[in-house]
Amino acid sequence: MLYSQWPERSGSRKDIADGVAVRTKSMARMAQKLAHIRKARGEFVSLLLQRLRGKPFFRQTMVSAADLEQGLTLVLPGIEAAGPFADAMVNGLASAVPGAVQIFYWGIPFPEGYLPNLMWLRRNRAKAAELAQMILRYQDRYPGRPVHIVANSGGAGPAIFAVELLPLDRKIDGLVFLGGAISSTYDLRGALRRLEKGIFNFYSHRDWIVLGVGTSLFGTSDRKPHIACGCVGFKRPTTNADPENLYAKLHQVKWKPALIDDCGHWGTHGFSASERYVRQYVAPWIAKK
């Protein structure tokens, strides 16, 4: 029997083609992931060099009075204090939400910040007081405009502390956590009373190295040796502990593998504030009235 006359195994060519497609897709995914990591690493090195050369470390985008008339979204970086993650959040929001988008720089500059930014509770509460006053001044000048806070990683601490300091008659609209470093058992009732729409918490079980092991060893932003809300989400209290049903305003979104293809979010800590993720999932909630 000639080779061409041999019976072909059913589906063999399709199986090979499917296998090639899967490998090609996997390689493209990995290339995107590595490009993201290289870009972030390069920008952090650039920031460090700027500090060594005595150049400004913090940079702020200019906002117009017309933007401020429409609302204000404040972005809090993580314990790195500034850099590509904060810039990614701003870029993801600026083109997708109404009003001004500004970074609130609360941390000690890179590289000496990091752990002190996570662990120095007194300083973080002082920065939270500054943030609360900034919000009140904005509300005095632009009453009735929407105000939101978006906090990444360790920025979740100063963010929620600031909300808790607001008078009950001076609520803001919403608070967003991206890979937040607050303990998963934190009592949110004080903050939820001061939020119209509530808290939007994005979390990922893949973030267990930083927000599981890391926060268990070094503590969360609220100084608990505990797994963080950015890894497992916030734990809801019993009904008896929440008679006002405030936790109805806690909205939680869990990472899922489909987000890799959807917006390049791999679920680990370095992707918790990615620009595409913020634009597609955070911005619509902020824009919603």
What are the language-model segments listed below?
Residues 1-105, 122-126, 133-142, 168-173, ...:
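Flexible, membrane-associating and regulatory peripheral segments of lipid-active enzymes
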Residues 59, 65, 87, 161, ...:
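Residue-level detector of functional hotspots within protein domains
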Residues 6, 210-289:
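C-terminal catalytic-base region of ester-bond hydrolases, centering on the histidine
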